[in-house]
Amino acid sequence: MARGKTDGSRKTRHAQRSGHGPAVVLFLAGALLFCWPWLSGAVTIPWDAKAHFYPQLAFLARALHEGQSPFWTPNVFGGHPQIADPQSLIFSPPHVLLALFDRAPSFVAFDALVFAMLVMGGLALMALFRDRGWRAEGALVAALAFAFGCSAAWRVQHVGQVVSLSWFAVALWLLMRAIDWRDRPRAWVWGAAAGLVAGLMLLGRDQVAWLGAIALAILGAGRALEACAAGGAWRGTLRALVKPLGAGSLVGALVIALPFAFTLALAAQSNRAAITFEGAAGGSLHPAALLTFVSANFFGTDGPLKDYWGPPSSMVWGETGLALARNMANVYLGALPLVALLCLGALRGGLLAREMRAFTCAALFMLLYALGRYTPFFALAFHLPGADLFRRPADATFLLGALFAVMAGYCVHRLFADDQRASGRRMAMEAGVVALAFLACVVTAFDKGRLQQAAPMLAASCAWLAVSLAFLWLAPRWRGRALAPLAGIGLLLAFDLRANNGPNESTALPPELYEALRPDARDPVIDALRERLAQSQGPDRRDRVELAAIDFHWPNASLVHGFDHWLGYNPLRLKWYADATGAIDHVAVADQRRFSPLFARYNSPMADLMGLRWIVTGPPAGDLDSRLAPGDLRLVARTPAAHIYENPRAFPRVLLVGRARKADFDSMIATGRWPQVDLRETVLLEDAPETMRARAPGSARIAAYRNTQVDVNVEAPEGGWLVLNDVWHPWWRAEVDGKPARLLRANVVFRAVELPAGAKSVTFRFAPFAGLAAQILGRAP
């Protein structure tokens, strides 16, 4: 009798484990179907993917292949500490590998890497299903919905968050394996692997990574409690978990320690050391956005922007106070997963099954968090450590989609494993629930006067829902037909996601739009800048450029081409630089070109000091600077996209001056008042002596200029001050004739070093590790 039961259970486990190989093949085929427009080069991932993340990769690759350090870049914001910036990709292993093997990564290679990470995450979930003995049909649903549903598809341009999400899936699989295999001799290896991958996830240092850590904690605790309850021996189970979980915690902590220290140090120096509750609440997900679970293009998300009527469109919804792009409000996971969650999960109890309770709790957490100010929960969650570092609770939809994908897959597993054939009464109830969800869309469209506009999308969604519901009713009848259910799921869900979450204005645009970002670009503006920068180069010069109000993707083009841009595109900027110059996170349109009291116009000491020689603007410069006077700038070229101006007053990058004067930099930033001195002969310092005779004139020339080291040859018969018009940062060090010298903050935001008589050489070197240690110990300047 016992042997018969054992044989039966083995057959059940074998049946549940069978089909995973074909499921993987179907998943990869579905992935190819979905990704082909990008992989073929017909379209490319636009917006932040190209405007921000691709230039970061291009800079990383260029630096590595030139034998330079990528830890600092002079190409944006007057200089920026890449090693501490979460979005620099320096601590993203797949991007580092691509940069090592390809000096100039193509758009296709960059996009392929993004999708490869999502495919990796999908495969990890399939491995999780196989480990747990869940059926391949459910694994296929989970993998497809995870990789190409919800925010993974609609926000694929947010590359860092997509990478964090992908690592989350792998970490989840390894964590569950470490807990399940706790009694095996090498369980600690799996725990260490889980910690390593969780650490890689957290290296993203974005909100998805932070929420992913919370989700892993909830799911890990749930699985551990489940194991304790199943075994009955709580103490023994908990003792067995110490090694794998301890190993994971140790490895994870080692992985993240140094990068986290750098980023926290940069945050303290930045324009956004913390986010206020009000600032974060503006990134809440509007409750109406949940209707896109039912109908992907319900609000016209993938059409022209003028036709979009979903939140936070003020013309339709009134003033919401939200700051979200339209694609951030789309959470479509596929009709089949939605029907599975509603019918098999909610009505048939799948979501409350023992294996799913932790997933349900984690999903509820993410849903409430994403809704932000629309529920009281976010006010409580905002007190969690780290919550005030992020500004958009709607980012939780990344994790919500991943959790829903697993939950939907589990519900499909139960459908086949338990042969859950629906009675007529149950079918009527399930059809009613799906109809109610669909009716909510219809009523909303009618209420907002958009029913006619939404009708085509609603009709398509109705068809996908009906087919998916019918499939789940009929599929259990095909249990004995080998691969028929798998093939049906693969075809239905893959084509659904391709049709509804496929290329659109938010996720796919022609690559020709981004020609200026190619390392070998043949763009008129890039060509003109290359020519003029070469012509104006001198022994003491390294002229800066401004790329303002040309287009969304232009501000970080300097990272690709090696231009020194005093602006850029990055939400994280050095506070003293942003305050002094007015630089904000972007300069894609005219009203983002902000002037500050200290940099009040193009004809200003700040513009001249930074060596701003070439100014490129989309509209005429006078549209950006209302105080521009004739002769302030000289128009030197016009292209179809831009005007190119020369500032003839731009200073060289290095100057040797003979006089110093004390100045209150905070007061200067606030009032915009410059002392009445000749800045070619005098340097402003915060702690200069009250009286100082002028030194005899000298000279300076740049001997070598690299990302993290600048060598300058000087002739200083009576000494003086060498001014380097690069942004000051406490992690830079200076040497004069090979001996350490004090690096001074000069002229509000730049660098200087005092020279003794007869000095011959000065070296400025970026020393982030020593600088970080000094900052932690309270010894930073």
Predicted segments, located by residue:
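Transmembrane helix irregularities
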Residues: 148, 152, 199-208, 253-255, ...
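Extracytoplasmic/lumenal acceptor-recognition loop(s) of multi-pass membrane glycoenzymes
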Residues: 486-610, 639, 644-692, 729, ...
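Short aromatic/hydrophobic helix-turn
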Residues: 141-153, 193-201, 395
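Hydrophobic alpha-helical membrane-insertion signals
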Residues: 3, 10-84, 108, 261-271, ...
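Active-site-proximal, structured, solvent-exposed surfaces of multi-pass membrane proteins
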Residues: 53, 556, 567, 636, ...
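Contiguous transmembrane helix-bundle modules in multi-pass membrane proteins
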Residues: 158-166, 174-197, 208-209, 213-241, ...
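Membrane-interface coil-to-helix junctions
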Residues: 30-125, 144-169, 279-335, 370-380, ...
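Transmembrane-helix signature of polytopic, membrane-embedded enzymes
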Residues: 125-148, 185-188, 425-426
